[in-house]
Amino acid sequence: MNRIRNFSIIAHIDHGKSTLSDRLIQVSGIVAARDFRDQILDSMDLERERGITIKSQTICLPYKAKDGAVYSLNLIDTPGHVDFSYEVSRAIASCEGALILIDASQGVEAQTVANLYLAVDHDLEIIPVINKIDLISADVERVMEQIEEDLGLDSSAAVKVSAKEGVGIEDLMETIVAKLPPPKGNLEAPLQALIFDSTYDDFRGTVIHVRVFEGKVKPGDMIMFMSNDSVYKVEEVGIFQIVRKPRKVLAAGEVGYIIAGIKSLSDTRCGDTITLKTNRCAAAMPGFREAKPVVFSSIFPIGSDEYEDLATAIDKLKLNDASLVYEKTSSLALGFGFRCGFLGLLHLEIVQERLEREYDQSLIITAPTVRYEVVYHDGTSMFIDNPELFPDPTLIQTTREPFIKASIIIPDKYMGAVMTLCMERRGISTTYHYLTGSRMEMVFELPLAEVMYDFYDKLKTVTQGYGSFDYEMLDYRDSRLVKLDILVNGERVDALSQLAHEDKAVERARHACKMLSEEIPRQMFKIPIQGAIGGKIISRETISALRKDVTAKCYGGDISRKRKLLEKQKKGKKRMKTIGKVAIPQSAFLAVLKSDQT
């Protein structure tokens, strides 16, 4: 056990986490040079293209140190995005140490700080690593100052590397062996293992990724999940070295996998504790909670005959993504589909892209919404995440919406622009303070619904790319919410209904009406497009009618002849308007829903 080191790499997005993992893998020599490729731990095409890590990956690296001993370095590669922060916290709980990776040209950013606090909470030994020292724009001295002042770490212990060029990787390996503590644990104690991730194998069922804290587990053992008391028989245990390597036993201090013929990912919850059925451990590992969806949206197939294909695709995707929540729904305008819950907007985008790419689906996705709380006059309350379920306003005493605490790190010259942006989004400024030099951290309390759409992009725009942002959930607060309906030719289109704050409703309604008026083709009669709150119309656009020139055949002569023909046309148009139906094309739905997300 003294020769094991468990660590994770935590960093802000784009600071070179996956590239550093690649170099550590190359130095350990477990992958032949001809089999090696960049971002080797990122198994999805989507991860490679976007340059982000979506799913945690684990790998056991054998390393022969300068003292002649061979060490097992267990690297747990974590996602960097705030949507997956619970996964990151479970991965960190599985380690004794962490490498805090900082880009030499960007410096300390918001998620670096957030993840550092997470590591400190779990009493991890921390090694600061300055990456990208080969860049012309690298300012190592400035970053070392930030490590001292912003993070409160000893900058003299920082290891300087260039993951891309492979500079300083040997030094980093030696530092990991020397600085990080070996795991503690008793081989004879009852089994206590933490689940920090799981994947689905078509042939073997669920593969559980675990860190064993106490005792040992081997094939044939009867294991039990402490959150739901379900029992399974272990078929195989082993470690990860890019591919799964079976072992006879997985013992205290080790990181590996367990296969036990589990058919569904929903049985294996991230953060749960595994023990033996016959010899239970005294307590579960602390910190377990259900992953709760934050953003909700409905997904419909473009053709109603493709519903069964979409159902199969979502079921398969759920096998590899336990945090995706969904139920069946239907819409008068779009037919049958699914109401889905996601961890955040990035999670929604990833699910959409995977359904379109891997399962060849053409989708319509409704405007994302958060979960609101409605309090009735009799004191009872309910949570709603679908505009269709919003009750009659006369029954409601108050509505409440979720707020977040947003931490924004920027150069101070952008303070005014960021303050304006946050105030426009109904933000409340709580504190701000200087970090190093001209860099400052601003803390705001913001409604989650206002951050959901394009806040991050707008922040990058007003700070010319220098702003970084991280958030955590706070609580629910009273808010003036209304249900905004869109009417086309007097008929409500349920798929375009949305919940909005009173102050933003008119702006949203105008925008939706304008987009629809540009996309719906003209008919032989006028089409009014209206935004309404209850019975009150708050915005309107009109698509003018196509007209046939009925007076073309009248050459000269009496004006009353022309008037008679025009009156006849007007009557026909009136009758057409009462019985005419407007078919809304798919492009119109897509235009409105896309514009809601931008």
Curated annotation (Swiss-Prot):
Gene3D superfamilies, per database record: 3.30.70.240, Elongation factor 4, C-terminal domain, Elongation Factor G (Translational Gtpase), domain 3, P-loop containing nucleotide triphosphate hydrolases, Translation factors
Q: Name one GO molecular function term.
A: ribosome binding
Q: Which reaction does it catalyse?
A: GTP + H2O = GDP + phosphate + H(+)
Name the Enzyme Commission number(s) assigned to this protein. Answer: 3.6.5.n1
Q: Which domain of life is it from?
A: Bacteria
Q: Does the keyword Transmembrane helix apply?
A: no
What is its membrane topology? Answer: Peripheral membrane protein
Q: Where in the cell is it found?
A: Cell inner membrane
- Record: residues binding GTP: 14-19, 131-134
Show the GO cellular component annotation of the record.
plasma membrane
Segments forming domain tr-type G: 2-184
Q: What keywords would UniProt list here?
A: Cell inner membrane, Cell membrane, GTP-binding, Hydrolase, Membrane, Nucleotide-binding, Protein biosynthesis
Q: Which GO terms describe its biological process?
A: positive regulation of translation
- Family (UniProt): Belongs to the TRAFAC class translation factor GTPase superfamily. Classic translation factor GTPase family. LepA subfamily.
The record's function comment reads:
Required for accurate and efficient protein synthesis under certain stress conditions. May act as a fidelity factor of the translation reaction, by catalyzing a one-codon backward translocation of tRNAs on improperly translocated ribosomes. Back-translocation proceeds from a post-translocation (POST) complex to a pre-translocation (PRE) complex, thus giving elongation factor G a second chance to translocate the tRNAs correctly. Binds to ribosomes in a GTP-dependent manner.
What PANTHER family does its record include? Answer: TRANSLATION FACTOR GUF1 HOMOLOG, CHLOROPLASTIC, TRANSLATION FACTOR GUF1-RELATED
- Provide the protein name: Elongation factor 4
* Underlying gene: lepA
